[in-house]
Amino acid sequence: MFIYVINGEGSMVNWNDEIKKWLTSGTDTKEDIMDMVWNVKDEKTYLIAENPKIPFTLYIYNSEKFIRIIASTGLNTALLEPLQRLDIYRKLLLLNDKIDMTKFVISGTNEEIILKVDLDAASLDKNEFGDALMGVLTSLYMMIREFQLEDEFNKRLTDRIVNMIQEKIAEGATREELLEFLVKKIGLDQKTAENILNEITNKFEYLPEYQ
């Protein structure tokens, strides 16, 4: 299912294609968030966007009037004690009062903390989408600080990078290609990249190819 919307100029826009182009056409050489190159999966009714530098998965839904960005935190509250949940919900409401456009909500049977923003498809362009994306990520990092979850999300980010490296090894990537990925894509210095790669490949079954 493809969602087409008539923009302000009267032309038809396939938002799945347009947003995917915005997220994948960067160079990873600038500080601008829209210059980051995202891995985007098109699930027809929504897009899944991931970046090795960001410990969150984005889900981008299209409707006739709105583009909705949802950031999954993986933090579920359904089984917490009532006082814990009350404290979390209070902090989320206070965060909502500090941020514009984006809002924290509780979603699903697991009552996961998610962040979402709705954008008007009739007037949406790349700059507005980039501003919304920056707002989403800024709000999420505010949440991390508020709940003192830096270690949790640093570990999640490390696990994502390790999984990506293992997938690339399984696909036949050379050591040079893996180092280039860690240095240019992730932004690590050469020595750190080599240490991480050594640690990963020492545990991987294709080790002989990389010695």
Describe the predicted segments one by one.
Residues F2-K53, L178:
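Charge-rich, low-complexity N-terminal segments
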Residues V37, V105-S107, R145-D159:
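Short, surface-exposed recognition loops or helix-turn segments adjacent to catalytic cores
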Residues F56-A78:
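A short acidic-to-branched-hydrophobic micro-motif
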Residues D87-I99, L119-D151:
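Ampiphathic alpha-helical segments that act as solvent-exposed interaction surfaces
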Residues I113-D118:
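Short, aliphatic-rich beta-strand segments
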Residues N154-F204:
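Acidic, Ser/Thr-rich low-complexity intrinsically disordered segments
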Residues E205-Q211:
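Short Lys/Arg-enriched helix C-cap and helix-to-coil transition segments
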